[in-house]
């Protein structure tokens, strides 16, 4: 089924690659392990969904509107390690060089952008696949939206959400 909208949670990919893969550096001593992992996962997804539109979405640096509403939002989360932070711009550059749209909106989390794009596309009848490791995204699943977990190559539709969480997506 071509012309699906494939929404990639780049921020989820970034942290997954950083924590799952060994630390790698290039000849200049720059960290590259997360970059290698993220780009590898995206390349596989593009190959698996050839003919579909792939869009990669990342969190922007800095606070979001949620911090304005609730100042303690993610206050206990440790800061991003420098070894990971320095890989973000090269990852973004590589994704753009691959010809893929990259969305990163100041003040808005990637999850919110993915949710908005998903609802808009599905509302128009377009099939949407969200590639993420974030379980919160299960609330977006409906007749037009499925999740894919690239770690184990499984997809989750409405029935899969009910099986995994015991409730339908709209109750998550």
Regions found by a protein language model. Give the residues of each.
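Extended two-metal-dependent nuclease catalytic cores across DNA- and RNA-processing enzymes
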Residues: 2, 24-25, 75-172
């Amino acid at each position: 089924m071509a012309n699906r909208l494939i929404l990639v949670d780049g921020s989820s990919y970034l942290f997954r690659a950083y924590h799952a893969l060994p630390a790698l550096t290039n000849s200049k001593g720059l960290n590259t392990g997360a970059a290698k992992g993220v780009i590898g996962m995206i390349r596989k997804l593009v190959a698996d969904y050839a003919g579909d539109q792939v869009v990669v979405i990342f969190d922007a640096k800095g606070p979001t509107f949620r911090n304005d509403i609730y100042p303690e939002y993610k206050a206990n989360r440790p800061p991003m390690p420098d070894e990971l932070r320095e890989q973000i711009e090269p990852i973004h550059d590589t994704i753009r060089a691959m010809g893929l749209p990259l969305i990163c909106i100041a003040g808005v989390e990637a999850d919110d952008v993915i949710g908005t794009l998903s609802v808009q596309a599905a509302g128009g009848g377009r099939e949407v696949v969200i590639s993420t490791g974030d379980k919160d995204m299960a609330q977006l699943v409906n007749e037009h939206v499925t999740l894919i977990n690239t770690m184990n190559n499984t997809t989750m539709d409405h029935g899969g959400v009910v099986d995994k969480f015991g409730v339908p997506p709209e109750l998550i």
